[in-house]
Amino acid sequence: MEAIHSNWTAPRIKADGIYYADDFDILTTILSALKWREKNGQIKMVTDSEGLRYYNERGMCGIWDAVTTELDNIPDVIDPSVFWAAGKIYSLVYSGTPAAVMDTDFIVWDKLAFDNLGEIAVIHDEDIYPDVYPDISHFNMKRGYVFDPELDWRLRPSNTAFYVIRNKELAELYTGEAVRFMENAAGGDSLTYMVFAEQRLLPMCSAMLGIDMYVISNLERLFRDGERWFTHTWGMKRQMRENTALRADFCRRCIRRITADFPEYESMLRGIEELRPYF
């Protein structure tokens, strides 16, 4: 199964003026890509020209089977400060199915039984917390935009840090509705609008087509023993930015794991300026 990493650099550039990645994000990106290739198949990075430049300068392009720059084509109407994860949606548009769509801070440690995952499988679903997943009246849309009346707002959202999608019709409906929503949002915050497009529309579109969604795990199980199969560092990032000791320990552990499992990449790691303090 081919996996897709994505990196749209526009959100960070708009926020900070330049593109950069934290040291721990560089390391999880490397570990995520290499572990997928070891256990589950090919993986590509869908990025933009700035992302390609960044990875080239650090000698990282070889961790993927391919690096493409289709995200240069994201239209200007998509606001990167609101839709900061739009690149992941567009990466599926440009890649098609079947595909495993995976965040760069998500690691799959072992071989997956893809035949058991059905037409669409997500890592876990989520409760409908009103401050994260508000109802339809919350959204301020451009004149003429109408939500599809078949969308079921009672469905639990899907966490899309990792999902496997085989059904072409579903991929086209989901990405089409997500892009239509993002293009027609009249402003909006960077949480509720983004997670609606990315995480709420997927189960809604699955239900519209009568496709059962397979939920791989749940938060309780992932917190209890998830590292046997999956690691997602999203929840640790703020802590690592605030705690230099925790950050250094995490980075050194990642480096040890990469050099133990993939010793041919040690010289690449040593050449990445952001990682030099850990050698």
Give the ranges of each region predicted by the language model.
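N-terminal anchoring/stem segment of glycosyltransferases
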Residues: 1-76, 236-245, 250-279
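Short glycine/proline-enriched coil/turn segments at helix->beta-strand junctions
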Residues: 38-42, 94-99, 117-119
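Conserved donor-nucleotide/metal-binding helix-loop-beta segment in metal-dependent transferases, i.e.
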Residues: 108-143
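The conserved acidic donor/metal-binding loop of glycosyltransferases
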Residues: 103-107
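Short, flexible, basic/aromatic active-site loop/helix in glycosyltransferases
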Residues: 140-153
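A conserved donor-nucleotide-binding helix/loop in the catalytic core
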Residues: 24-26, 31-32, 73-102
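Catalytic core and acceptor-binding pocket of nucleotide-sugar-dependent glycosyltransferases
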Residues: 152-241
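Short catalytic/ligand-binding loop motif for oxyanion handling, primarily in non-cytosolic enzymes
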Residues: 52-56, 108-111, 130-132, 171-173, ...
